[in-house]
Regions:
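N-terminal nucleic-acid engagement/recognition segments and initiation subdomains in replication
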Residues: 1-137
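P-loop NTPase catalytic core of nucleic-acid-dependent motor ATPases
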Residues: 27-29, 111-185
């Protein structure tokens, strides 16, 4: 099948720990990682086929090709660790910006920086939206106090809420739960 041959020539097929097929697509300025059955991969495949043949792909042909590619990734591909939005990396964490350039933010105790190609594999869901690139402190002063202007959190609870908020980005810890108690209204 032409679609399967096209993917095998341009991608690497793998699977994650849950045995979901994953395609790693090297691009000139980035690397994209899509689950085979997600719309992002199908969109990429339709565009690649259009560029190669200047033809569309019938729905039944696409479904058959995706099933074959998923089987190849699950049975022949290596298991790779795939992350959604955040991942532990060396001495810090990576946060996927979900932008068109597939950039991530590497956060360490010394600060943060934008990385163009993440050392870990990030995949995306169809509903993910891009996150803004942080503004360096030299350009504008970051002020966590602005958060409290938009929330009704008592001063004595703010440190706990801030710790909860930061821990939400750490994928290697138990998932924290914030219990908000107050009168309705």
């Amino acid at each position: 099948d032409e679609l399967v041959a096209l993917v095998r020539a341009q991608c690497q097929l793998h699977h994650d720990a849950d045995r979901n097929a994953v395609a790693v697509i090297p691009m000139p300025s980035r690397r994209e990682v899509w689950r085979v059955y997600y719309s992002g991969f199908e969109d990429w495949l339709r565009a690649a086929y259009w560029r190669a043949k200047e033809m569309g792909v019938p729905e039944t042909t696409m479904k058959s090709a995706l099933a074959t590619l998923a089987a190849a990734g699950i049975n022949d591909g290596d298991e790779i660790e795939v992350h959604v939005r955040a991942a532990r990396c060396d001495d810090g964490y990576l946060i996927d910006l979900a932008d068109e350039q597939w950039q991530a933010i590497h956060v360490t105790p010394l600060g943060w920086r934008v990385v163009n190609e993440s050392p870990v594999y990030f995949t995306r869901t169809p509903s993910m939206r891009p996150r803004p690139v942080p503004v360096p402190i030299g350009v504008t002063h970051g002020d966590v106090g602005l958060l409290w202007q938009h929330t009704n959190i008592p001063a004595h609870s703010r440190l706990m809420v801030l710790a909860w908020l930061l821990d939400c980005f750490r994928p290697d810890t138990p998932f924290p739960v914030l219990e908000l108690v107050g009168e309705q209204g």
